[in-house]
């Protein structure tokens, strides 16, 4: 949640989407090779994240793969591209298993295309590239984590009911969206009044064991108050208040595609991970060379339609030297927050939708 909150501060009027699973996986890979204060900071951050993660989903930092057996439609993959001149310690190579490939970073364009092709393959063609420009010839290692999620709705929206409706970007700005309709479904729902405003939470299930949770403020511009006040603890508390209600749901079709990846370096530094960058970086359990994290890139994609949701994310580290008597109607027609989670509560993707593309 913390990285997401930092990002929405930097992009207040934009659609934001990240995959905590992908980011944590990449940080865990780095922790395999970290020592000293670098290892202390990474371990502390991962431990703090794990405090808000179900016990059977915690990253124990002993496996490079993020295994989520309850969500068969989620595929994760990790890859390390390193200079063919670096000799890695056997203990590090043993921990990262097979996700390892040597490349010649002097051939920057070829290496860029190699990495982008892997990203495209691992995300089922939904993210065509992580790198938009060639890597520096000084790059010594690149750590890439890809996540691809696709799930059919348990209660599909009827295509013939989809219609054009208004979406309020703000009180003064209105646009049009394709509004999907699903009626008379028993869904988990709650309306909550907090000091900062009222909002609704609705849990929309997929086939299998995952769901999308929507947090919809009562006020058209109420998303900003939710952004400021939401925490992992509050989100868990709110979800614990959900109960089954018969719902008529009106929800926009939406797609979010990023034109440029997020560079998470300043955000990670703000969150206390200062010693994975620059002079104080210590990755001596990885190799004997003095290497540091130069870039930490994260890019995402999501497509929500009548039949399914498909989402992907890629994180790259570049190292250089949501039976009643009545039905509740929920109209999602202004900015909202959403999460895709598995049935243990682990958040796979978290986003804010405020501007139809």
Curated annotation (Swiss-Prot):
Coiled coil: none annotated. One of its GO terms (molecular function) is serine-type endopeptidase inhibitor activity. Gene3D superfamilies: Alpha-1-antitrypsin, domain 1, Antithrombin, subunit I, domain 2. The record marks 322-323 as: Reactive bond. It is found in: Host cytoplasm. Transmembrane segments: none annotated. It holds the Pfam family Serpin. GO terms for cellular component: extracellular space; host cell cytoplasm. SMART domains: SERPIN. Keywords: Host cytoplasm, Protease inhibitor, Serine protease inhibitor. InterPro entries: Serpin_CS (IPR023795), Serpin_dom (IPR023796), Serpin_fam (IPR000215), Serpin_sf (IPR036186), Serpin_sf_1 (IPR042178), Serpin_sf_2 (IPR042185). This viral protein may be involved in the regulation of the complement cascade. Involved in red pock formation. Belongs to the serpin family. Poxviruses subfamily. PANTHER family: GH10112P-RELATED, SERINE PROTEASE INHIBITOR, SERPIN. This is Serine proteinase inhibitor 1. It comes from Rabbitpox virus (strain Utrecht). The gene is SPI-1.
